[in-house]
C-alpha cells in the first residue's frame, strides 16, 4: 500500500510529455501541469476563483473538458497562442468573463472569435520596398481623426504581431474590467480603463461589435501635409479623411517614426490608397520635403488644375510655412 501511494505521489510530481511537451512556453507548461494535476486529484488550482465568476464546481467541469481536448490535440500546444486557441474552442459555450479570466490566470493571450478560427489560405503579398511592418486595424472611431493627415488606430491584441507583447497585468486588468462592467461596478471599471489606457491599450469594438483589447498607434499619413485645423480648409480636410475611414478597418504600411512618436505610413481603406484621394480632392499638399514620389506630385497637380478643395483659393498657404510663422510669432 505504501509503495502504491509513493508511486502515485511521484506520478503527480513528474511532468508528463503528454501534458508538458518539451520546449513548451512556461505559461503552456503551467496549464498542462494543472490539467494533469486535475486528472489525478480532481482539484482545481488555488487562485483561479479570483479571476473568474463561476463556482469551483463549474471550474472542475472546464478541466474535465480540457483533459479530453488536450489529449486529442495534435500537436500538443507549445506556444501561448496555440494553448489560448485550444482553451477558447473548448470553453466556447461558457461566459466570456470566465474564459478571459481563465486565460489571464495562465498569462495566455485573449483571442477573439475570428482569431480562434483559422483564416482561409491567401497568397503571400510582399510588403512594399522600405516598409518596416504592416498593421491591420479595428474599425476606426469618429474621434480617431485629429486632422487631415493624422489618425489614431487600434490593433487587436489577438493579432500575431501584438499577442506576445501584451503585459500580463494589462490582460488581467482588461478581464477584470469586463467583469466589473457586467456587475455594473462602473467606478472600478473606470479605474481599470485608465490603467489600460496609460499603458497604450484600450478595449474597443471589433467588426462584430464585440469589445476586445487593442494596442493604440498614432499614424501620420506619409507624403502629404493637410491644412492645420486653424487654417483655411483645415476642417474640410479633416472631414474628408473622416468620411473615408470612419467605421472601416484599414491596412497601414509603416515606414518610419516621426519625432512625435507617430508611425509614418501609407493607409489603404477597402483597397483605396487614402493619400491619393486626399491629394486628388485638394485636401492636402504633397509634402515634398519628406517624400518625392512622382505619383503624389501628379495627383496634387490634377487637383490644382481643377481648382479642387484648398486650390479654390487664389493663394493657399503651405501648412509647413504656416507652422513656421506660428513658431516665429508672425502667423
Swiss-Prot record:
Lipidation (N-myristoyl glycine): 2
Enzyme class of the recorded protein, top EC level: hydrolase
A GO CC annotation given for this chain: plasma membrane
Domain TNase-like: 136-313
Region Disordered: start-end pairs: 306-331
Active site, per annotation: 220, 228, 262
A GO molecular function held by the record: metal ion binding
SMART domains referenced in this protein's UniProt entry, alphabetically: SNc (SM00318)
Similarity comment text for this entry: Belongs to the thermonuclease family.
Function: Enzyme that catalyzes the hydrolysis of both DNA and RNA at the 5' position of the phosphodiester bond.
Name of the protein in its database record: Probable staphylococcal-like nuclease CAN1
Species this protein is from: Oryza sativa subsp. japonica (Rice)
